[in-house]
Amino acid sequence: MKFWRERERENKEQILAPLCGQVRVLVVGDSGVGKTSLVHLINKGSSIVRPPQTIGCTVGVKHITYGSPASSSSSIQGDSERDFFVELWDVSGHERYKDCRSLFYSQINGVIFVHDLSQRRTKTSLQKWASEVAATGTFSAPLPSGGPGGLPVPYIVVGNKADIAAKEGTKGSSGNLVDAARHWVEKQGLLPSSSEDLPLFESFPGNGGLIAAAKETRYDKEALNKFFRMLIRRRYFSDELPAASPWSISPVPTSSSQRLDEITSDDDQFYKRTSFHGDPYKYNNTIPPLPAQRNLTPPPTLYPQQPVSTPDNYTIPRYSLSSVQETTNNGSARSKRMDINV
């Protein structure tokens, strides 16, 4: 019995769950912090020697598979995992595009803030970027409470150019930057290894975030993939989130049954106002319908009405006007001929 119950649930999930989907992630930060190099590293897995200057916005697409948490561990991989596409919108940070880059802030699922570890001012300006996106953007599956600058979607902070910062002695080390950063974040209790969700930092500037060196193809791939899967889960599998989770917001709608009762009661009141008192067939000559058809309205006529044919067994002959005129004319003609003969 349990086997059939699980099989029925898996079939239902396969029918209802989307076969594929997409989430949109903004990549914002000051000009020159390495956003284009980071997006190229995430999508291609390799560094770019001379990244071109971004004009307006550049979109990169990353393919990722996601399995529904409600799927059974014994189910086939093809049935539980589905394909999704992560759109990484690399928005130019140059001041010349300040007045028009809000065109790209639409239907946002998440934000990646990028700053340069060798230039502290680029991290300070992240607050300005958060306020700009929150004020002019539209969002998909927003959070119940906003983050920095009122940003209503999940975000993550990436400190890029850790290799340059290490050489200058500003921040970082010459060792494995990914392991060092992950160890520090887990030590601070910000990134539990057993959790699907990533920490959201409350304000800028602050300690924490991911460390990357796009030129040396170093970044925390696992953490970013968790971030992308969290966005997919919030958009396409929101019913599987815990009830008290802060990741979803849903106003309390009017239930369909309550609305149906209201409509039914209104119809009853209208029927009571327009109904006859007593038997409506008592004071006219109409024949009452069958009891089962009393409250049913006749179906609409979908074809033109045909004229009723008259039977031919009448005792009184009927003549048309033309035949009468023809008979009259024949009689007058005969009388004239008789007069002539006489």
UniProtKB/Swiss-Prot annotation:
Primary site of residence: nucleus
Disordered: annotated segments: 274-313, 323-342
UniProt cross-references to CDD domains, sorted A to Z: RabL3 (cd04102)
Any one of the GO BP annotations: circadian regulation of gene expression
Gene3D superfamilies: P-loop containing nucleotide triphosphate hydrolases
Keywords noted in UniProt: Cytoplasm, GTP-binding, Nucleotide-binding, Nucleus
SUPFAM superfamilies registered for this protein in UniProt: P-loop containing nucleoside triphosphate hydrolases (SSF52540)
Record region (Small GTPase-like): 12-285
GO CC annotations, alphabetized: cytoplasm; nucleus
Induction text: Not regulated by the circadian clock.
Phenotype of the disrupted gene, per the record: Short-period phenotype even in darkness and short hypocotyls in response to red and blue light but not to far-red light. Altered cell shape and increased ploidy levels at the seedling stage. Hypersensitivity to salt stress.
Similarity comment: Belongs to the small GTPase superfamily.
Function noted in UniProt: Functional small GTPase that acts as a negative factor controlling the light-dependent period shortening of circadian rhythms and light-induced phase resetting during the subjective night. May protect the clock from excessive or mistimed light. Suppresses red and blue light-mediated photomorphogenesis and is required for light-controlled inhibition of endoreplication and tolerance to salt stress. The entrainment of the circadian clock is independent from the other pleiotropic effects. Could be a regulator of seedling establishment.
Name this protein carries in UniProt: Small GTPase LIP1
Species of origin: Arabidopsis thaliana (Mouse-ear cress)
